[in-house]
């Protein structure tokens, strides 16, 4: 559905949109490359003080260490490459990174809940592994560019705007929207 053009696309089973399959190095499992169909995105970062759910990953049996299910972005029924969070206002906990930089509400999005070396959707902020994290201020209601993969983008975060309770991540067009609904 395209609200701007006021159009709706209907797909048949033959032309159904398919989820994105990504490949990356999974050093926790020692499987390189690891392939995974993206069917959920997890919020990762200091936004919630790095809180995580207890338990183990169903697929691997590895302990969960990085994310809380209540902040997961759910795959859209209309397009399997679009993920949506609609819920409580997101926390904006102030956290200091390992380089001494303090920000409130920093977040990016990942495919794994047991490792920080998965496939990520990060901001366009300048970041470099083992040198610096990057942080991008965003406005509610404004679509932002994103960088996907398993490179320096894992260290590039969005700063959640005040009052945000709605997030859309589009991994087909590499965009992120934070909003208040």
Q: How would you describe each model-predicted region?
A:
Residues 1-18, 116-178:
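Structured interaction patches on ligand/partner-binding surfaces of diverse proteins
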Residues 24-32:
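Short amphipathic, basic-aromatic surface patches that mediate peripheral association
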Residues 27, 180-181:
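Primarily marks secretory-pathway-exposed extracellular/lumenal segments that are disulfide-
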Residues 35-104, 115-140:
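Aromatic-rich carbohydrate-binding modules that target alpha-glucans
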Residues 106-108:
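Short, conserved beta-strand segments of beta-strand-rich sandwich/propeller modules, principally
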């Amino acid at each position: 559905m395209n609200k701007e053009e006021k159009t709706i696309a209907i797909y048949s089973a033959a032309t159904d949109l398919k989820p994105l399959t990504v490949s990356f190095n999974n050093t926790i499992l020692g499987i390189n490359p690891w392939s995974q169909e993206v069917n959920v995105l997890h919020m990762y970062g200091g936004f919630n003080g790095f809180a995580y759910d207890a338990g183990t990953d169903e697929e691997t049996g590895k302990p969960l260490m990085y994310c809380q299910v209540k902040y997961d972005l759910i795959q859209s029924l209309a397009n399997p490459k679009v993920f949506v969070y609609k819920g409580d206002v997101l926390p904006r906990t102030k956290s200091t990174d390992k380089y001494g930089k303090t920000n409130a509400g920093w977040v990016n999005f990942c495919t794994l809940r047991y490792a920080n070396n998965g496939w990520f959707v990060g901001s366009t902020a300048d970041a470099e592994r083992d040198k610096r994290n990057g942080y991008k201020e965003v406005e509610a209601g404004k679509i932002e560019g994103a960088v996907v993969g398993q490179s320096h983008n894992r260290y590039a975060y969005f700063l959640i705007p005040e009052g945000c309770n709605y997030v859309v991540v589009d991994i087909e067009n590499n965009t992120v929207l934070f909003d208040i609904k």
